[in-house]
Amino acid sequence: MSSDSMRNIRNFSIIAHVDHGKSTLADRIIQLCGGLQAREMEAQVLDSNPIERERGITIKAQSVSLPYTAKDGQTYFLNFIDTPGHVDFSYEVSRSLAACEGALLVVDAAQGVEAQSVANCYTAVEQGLEVVPVLNKIDLPTADIERAKAEIEAVIGIDAEDAVAVSAKTGLNIDLVLEAIVHRIPPPKPRDTDKLQALIIDSWFDNYLGVVSLVRVMQGEIKPGSKIQVMSTGRTHLVDKVGVFTPKRKELVALGAGEVGWINASIKDVHGAPVGDTLTLAADPAPHALPGFQEMQPRVFAGLFPVDAEDYPDLREALDKLRLNDAALRFEPESSEAMGFGFRCGFLGMLHMEIVQERLEREYNLNLISTAPTVVYEVLKTDGTIIPMDNPSKLPPLNHVEEIREPIIRANILTPPDYVGNIITLCEEKRGSQIGINYLGSQVQISYELPMAEVVLDFFDKLKSVSRGYASLDYHFLRFQVGPFVRVDTLINGDKVDALSIIVHRSYADRRGRELCEKMKELIPRQMFDVAIQAAVGSQIISRSTVKAMRKNVLAKCYGGDVSRKKKLLEKQKEGKKRMKQVGRVEIPQEAFLAVLQMDK
C-alpha cells in the first residue's frame, strides 16, 4: 500500500490510570465521530464484558475504527485501541501500544499523575510513540490544570505545555482532542518490505465463527479468500471475512496497511492464532516476524478445582477458550488428595486471578474451589539442580534442599507527601528495603525492593488504606534472593491437607501456624467426634486447636434407675465415637481454603 493511502490513518491508544476517565473519553470520541447514534450510546461502550462494567475497569483491549472530518476539510480514519489501566493487565497495554503510532496520556486534573500511567507512558516512549497529554475532569471544582501540567513534566518528563484540557463527562473540548490526534500523531510509516505482515493484538472465540483475531496490518493487505500463515507455528488458514469495529462489527472487502481490524479464518483450534504473533501470506511470506512484545510470565499460582468432579473436562475447555483471549494465563493439570483433579493456574496478580475465576464461573457456569495463591520460588537442591516451585505441597524434603530463593520486585509508589511515613512503615512491615525517595512537585516517589509474596496478596489494599486511596503502585520483577523459608503444613486429624500448605519466612512460621489453626477452628463445622487441627513444620507440630465434638444426650431416656445403666450408655457412646473417628472424613468447606488468604488482614 502506498504512503499516500496511509497518510490519513491515525492509530492511537489511550494510557490512563484506573478511574481517570479513559473509557468515558473513548465514548465521547465515538459519539463525536458518529460511530453510534445517540440512542445506541451507553456508558463505557468498549467495556463489553459485564465484569468490566461492574468493577468500572477495563480488562481486555478493545478496538474501534472511526472516520473523522477534521477542520482542514480532510477525512481521517482513526483506529483507537482501548487499553486497561490496572497494574495486573500491563501486558495488554504493551500489546496494544505495539500496534499504534501515538498515545493519549489521560490524567485526572484533580488527582494528578499516578504510578500506573507513568509505567505505561515509559513503555510508549520506549516504543517510539508520540504521546499527547490530555487533562480530564476539568469540570470538577478540585481540578488544578497548572499543577497537573507541572506534575506530568516533573514525574514523566514529557512536555505538557500543549496539553488539551477536557471534560469527558460533559463533552467539553473533545473536538480539540480529535484535532490533536490528527495533527500530532504521525501516520503509519511504510515498511521496507511489501509482503504482508500483520500483528495479532487479540483473539477470542466465537461459537459460530471459531477464532476471531484483532490485527494491525503493518504492510500488505488481507482479503477474504487469501491464504495466510501464522509465522510462529507455520500453520496456514483461509481467510473468510475481514472487517472493522465501528464499534459494531462491519465487514470490508480488504484490510490494508496501517489499518486495524478483525479477521476470521475459521480457525477452530484455540491455539491457532497466538496473540503477539505475525500473520503473512502463505504463497509469499515475509522474511521475518514483527518484533512482538515480550511474553508475560505469570507471578501468582493457585489451584482451581471443580466442586463436582464431573465438570473437569468442561473446566479444561473453558480454560482453553479463556487462554486464547488472555495470553498471560497459564495452566496445567494437577491432582490433589484433598480436592481431586483440577488445574494449577498461573496469573499476573490477584485481580487477574479473581477475574479469571469470576469469568469461569459466570461465562461457563462452573462451580470452582480455588486454593491459596502462591508465588514462584526457586529451589536449589543438594545435587545442584534448580527447580521452579509454584506449589508448596511439591517442595522436596528439606534434607534435599540446599536453599530456597524468593522473587524480589522493585516497587515504585507515588503518593502525596502526607502519607510518606505510613507507606514506609507498611513497606518495612513487609520486609522491604528502601532504594530511594524523590520529591517531584506535589508528589513523592518512593522506591522499595519487596518480596513478591508480600506484595501479591493484600499489599495493594493496605497501601490504599494507609494513604486514604491517594497512593498508586507499579512494580516489576527484579531477581530471586535466598531466604530462610519453611513449609507450614496443616494436619486435620493427623492427615495432611496438601491444598493448605504454605511457604513462609521462618520468623513468621509460628504466628502463621497459630493463625491458621484458629481460623480453621472457626470454619470447620463440628462433627460427632473431636477434630484436631495442627500446623507442622516438617515433623514438628507448632500449633494445635480442637473442634469439640457434638454430643447427643444418650441419658435423656433414663428416668432415675441404676447408675450402672447410665454408665453403660455413656461407654457405648464413647466406643461409637472412637470408631467414627477412625473412619470419619472431615469435609473442609471452601471458606477454609480461602482462610489462608485472609490471615494477614
From Swiss-Prot:
It comes from the Bacteria. One of its GO terms (cellular component) is plasma membrane. GO terms for biological process: positive regulation of translation. GO terms for molecular function: GTP binding; GTPase activity; guanosine tetraphosphate binding; ribosome binding; translation elongation factor activity. Gene3D superfamilies: 3.30.70.240, Elongation factor 4, C-terminal domain, Elongation Factor G (Translational Gtpase), domain 3, P-loop containing nucleotide triphosphate hydrolases, Translation factors. It is found in: Cell inner membrane. It catalyses: GTP + H2O = GDP + phosphate + H(+). Its EC number is 3.6.5.n1. Pfam families: EFG_C, GTP_EFTU, GTP_EFTU_D2, LepA_C. Coiled coil: none annotated. Residues 7-189 form the tr-type G domain. It is a peripheral membrane protein. Required for accurate and efficient protein synthesis under certain stress conditions. May act as a fidelity factor of the translation reaction, by catalyzing a one-codon backward translocation of tRNAs on improperly translocated ribosomes. Back-translocation proceeds from a post-translocation (POST) complex to a pre-translocation (PRE) complex, thus giving elongation factor G a second chance to translocate the tRNAs correctly. Binds to ribosomes in a GTP-dependent manner. Belongs to the TRAFAC class translation factor GTPase superfamily. Classic translation factor GTPase family. LepA subfamily. This is Elongation factor 4. It comes from Xanthomonas campestris pv. campestris (strain ATCC 33913 / DSM 3586 / NCPPB 528 / LMG 568 / P 25). The gene is lepA.
